[in-house]
Amino acid sequence: MPALGNDAPAPDIDSPYREANSTGPLPRLAVGVLVALCAAKLLLHIFTSVRHYGYFRDELYYLDMARHLDWGYVDAAPLIALYARIALWMGGSLAALRILPALAGAALVALTILIARELGGGRYAQFLAGLSVLLCPAVLLADSLLTMNAFEPLFWMGCIWVVARILRTGDSRLWLWFGLLAGLGLENKHSTLSFGFAVTVALLLTHHRREFARRWIWIAAAIALALFLPNILWQIRHHFPTIEDLANVRREGKNVVLGPLAFVKEQIIDIGPILLPVWLSGLVWFLRDRRWRVLGLTFAVFFVLMEVAHAKNYYVFPIYPMLLAGGAVVIESAIESTFERRLGTRAAQTQTATRAAVAIIVFASLPAVPLVTWMLPPERLLAYQNAIGFKPAKAEVHHESLLPQPIADQFGWPEMVGEVAAIYNSLPPDERAQTGIWAGNYGEAGAINLFGPQYGLPRAYSRHQTHWYWGPPPQVYKNLIVIQWGLDDVRDNCTSYQAFEHYQRFGMGEENQPIYLCRGVTFDIQKIWWHSHHWN
């Protein structure tokens, strides 16, 4: 593959836009800035991500995936299971789990700095771009949990860096790197398909459409397809469960649907109001500048696609570092133009202006940091939310909790497992041997499977999402400890039952339901297992 580190234009004189995009050497890379900001990002997450809270519901699910490595899952591409497997290899602790997204976040800061440099940004633009990503609330939240969302912007911005180099140098061979990163991105999260679609449409809407007459972009597409193929084959073999899952979510109205204005409003809030001038100036510059218009159109197409599809607002977040990098270059240029060329001021005065701009961004961004990192215990976080008048937006219709959902979903799991263990271990040994655990949700099943062994609990089974494929249990149980069953289900399927109250103040409201000991199960779990599943 062609080298990504080559700063000079490529000698490929046949490129369709070679002459228009030839440039001189890139600005010097601000290595000290890059190292300092990446270190700050990493240390921030190391010191906050394991304080006061526990495992996130989805993290428990991914740890179960890590014990069942496969080329696909009902609601996830396969790489998330590999990340979790690495965390298990490192001990499976919360710290081992959370160091991976922290590293991804630090890498994203570095990549954003490289994009700003590729766009012609000097030392200040590189610093502002990296700082903006470091302080962006949406990015801080994503990098505080082990989910595919922490890694998604890394793959996308890697692709954008490649596109920017192609636009600057005209070296079409670099599409091979795009294909590699896009293929890995598809194995990380399927929404990379929409990102790739947006890039394709953006190219077709500009004079760069001529790139499709060359072989490199098609070879890149073949590379991406080859990397994505194992997951496609898994989907075919399992009759496309991901499509069924998405259809169920839409049909059941699980997610809050935002109108166009509300969608834009949530973007501004979550990216950070103080960063609006940064990313908006980047978007305007991209759309107005013929050379970088592909980048602006990529964002525009993707944004419209997500709004029309009524996607969750965070689906757009991975593409913003590109705009923050562009905006940083615009601001650097504007300051230099205003203070040096028009006013004839000295370099020292220009530095004062740039430092003032940085200070404004830092101090205006700080109030959001406690809301998206785990630095405050729940009582103080509630008090802080009330003090600043912050009310977290709901992403799901049935979300009921005192705290934002990403935080509430970290509460109550060890306590719930302890309660199940108390029920299980209170049974006589012969009855215990005939008692299984049925969880209604992958979070409960994952918690039992993570914390249960220390209590001697058997593995929990569930028909929720991919857990359905990991069943049925190897034996027919006479009794079940059931979590997230309604009372009617218990009465219909148990000869007798006992209810045990379960309550967690800061957890999700849906978890505050009784745990039941169901004696004399009236069905054969192995026979009914494959009759239905719960995908939503």
Task: List each model region and its residues.
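Transmembrane-helix signature of polytopic, membrane-embedded enzymes
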Residues: 3-4, 14-17, 21-23, 27, ...
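Short helix- or helix-capping micro-motifs
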Residues: 38, 126-134, 182, 186, ...
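Specific aromatic-rich, kink-prone transmembrane helix
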Residues: 111, 151-169, 174-182, 326
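Short acidic/glycine- and proline-prone juxtamembrane loop motifs at membrane-interface regions
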Residues: 138-152
